[in-house]
């Protein structure tokens, strides 16, 4: 069995003289063993965890390395020399010279070194000629010295110039100076990290070496502080609405009057949904203090006598029922308020509204029903809207949500006509499930 990296390091360290002067540089040791430096660093840290087997002191050294551009110059020569060699004895049009690779930098450097001259009055336009017979590529020679490990022989001015031209990089290397510890040994003894039931039962734990606790380790981050799945879905839905040009409606009133929750939406006062078995009514305050008088009169007339193409429900509409406070059963009450305020503006402006908030129902609790849940609401107000516009908007919304297989089924809502239920095909359940309700508001 071949020795491990840690064992190879200990064997090499054993041959070093004792005392503070003896030891190994991790960079030199990695090169001598033919290993990647990070692999050797891992072995050093493993040996440090064993106790006083070794001592490791962190050191930092700086060295110069060629950049990607520097590697190119080392291989092909500097831009100024390449341009000089590209200029024939009869000269070269400046426009052609500028098309060569690295010509911009090469031309300025060659002109500064007085290797080339520019004749602006030459026939056919400015022309470049050689000003000397031959040149030496000092930049390439300097980079070759760095590549061969002799970068220290370069002057500070030469290094600064190469660095400014982005041909040279100053790299800081972190390494370790490794020495023998007080408990040095070439044999690596495996330390136990877990106390198992078998060790306790057999008593073998008494003779086994255990790894000491590392109280400086960060440990695993605690699994807490995550967003609730409902908040994640809410954020996703909100982003989809905003991408489609919708504006969020204010929905900060969990307590709503029966007028806005039911009556303004053409829901009769004898409707089963308004019964205490389906709705949470408030005892204090039991009634809403104010309702818009003119609008309430129009709503009362439509319920009692009809209007706007409707026959009404033909019953005695009571303001006492409309004033009753409740926990809103849907956020469509917010849509009714928003449309009411839109109508009062005088000049009509097309709008798109949405809301995502809690609603409350006096439901029997089971696996699929809660007394409190979230409703996603969207409303579009414009002239000339049709059922096709509604279906297109729904298709766009659900497609952004990742639901593309949709079906629309005719339905009845008190406040919309026509109305549709929206179904999506569930790949897991292998059936169509209802995902929404929709319709065109009665005018």
Curated annotation (Swiss-Prot):
One of its GO terms (molecular function) is phenylalanine-tRNA ligase activity. Its EC number is 6.1.1.20. It is an enzyme of class 6 (ligase). Keywords: Aminoacyl-tRNA synthetase, ATP-binding, Cytoplasm, Ligase, Magnesium, Metal-binding, Nucleotide-binding, Protein biosynthesis. GO terms for cellular component: cytoplasm; phenylalanine-tRNA ligase complex. SUPFAM superfamilies: Class II aaRS and biotin synthetases. InterPro entries: aa-tRNA-synth_II, aa-tRNA-synth_II/BPL/LPL, Phe-tRNA-synth_IIc_asu, Phenylalanyl-tRNA_Synthase, PheRS_DBD1, PheRS_DBD2, PheRS_DBD3. It is found in: Cytoplasm. It catalyses: tRNA(Phe) + L-phenylalanine + ATP = L-phenylalanyl-tRNA(Phe) + AMP + diphosphate + H(+). Its cofactor is Mg(2+). GO terms for biological process: phenylalanyl-tRNA aminoacylation; protein heterotetramerization. The keyword Zinc does not apply. It comes from the Eukaryota. Gene3D superfamilies: 1.10.10.2320, 1.10.10.2330, 3.30.1370.240, Bira Bifunctional Protein, Domain 2. The keyword Metal-binding applies. L-phenylalanine binds at residues 332, 375-377, 415, 441. It holds the Pfam family PheRS_DBD2. Mg(2+) binds at residue 417. Belongs to the class-II aminoacyl-tRNA synthetase family. Phe-tRNA synthetase alpha subunit type 2 subfamily. This is Phenylalanine--tRNA ligase alpha subunit. It comes from Gallus gallus (Chicken).
